Amino acid sequence: TGWFKTDWLCEWKFNEERFPDPKGFIQGLKKKGYRVSLWQLPYVAENAEQIDEARKNDYIAPLTKKQDSEGSNFSALDYAGTIDFTYPKATEWYKGLLKNLLDMGVTCIKTDFGENIHMDALYKGMRPELLNNLYALLYQKAAYEITKDVTGDGIVWARSAWAGCQRYPLHWGGDSCSSWDGMA
C-alpha cells in the first residue's frame, strides 16, 4: 500500500512524495529486469478522491441504509461502496483507473478482496444475494481484460475466487486462517 496517494486508501494514484515520477521509476525497474504489480481493491472509500464521481455516475452501488464500519480497511463494510461490475459503465470506469497505471508500465494488478460486497446495496444488474459469489469473477474479468489489452499479457494476481475465475490467471491462496475451519 506504500504506493497509494494516501496510505491504505485505494485511489489508484501514486503518492507524489514517495514517487514523484512513477512512470520513470517503473521504467527504471523494468530496465533492471523487474516487473511491477500493484495492490488494490474494488471498493471506494468515503474520503477517496473518486467518491463524488463514483456516486454521481452509479459506479458504486448505492447503499439502502447506513453501514456500521468495523474500523479497519479490510472489509467492504468499511468502504462507502462496492464498484458495481454488473453495470458496464462502472466496469469501464474501473478499467480506466487501471489503464492509467498500466500505461505507466505496471504489468500486473493484484485484485485483492472481492469476496465481500455490500449486501444492502442496489446493484444495477443483479440482486446482492446472487451477486455475492459471482462478484469475484466479474472483478477479475475486468482487471484481466484491461491488463491484456494494454500489456498483451492477461495476468492478474487474485485472491478471491468463484467458479470460472480460473480463466483469469493467477490465483493464490493467501490470507486463509490457520485453523481447521480456515481450511474448509
Regions found by a protein language model. Give the residues of each.
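Catalytic-domain carbohydrate-binding cleft regions of carbohydrate-active enzymes
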Residues: T1-A184
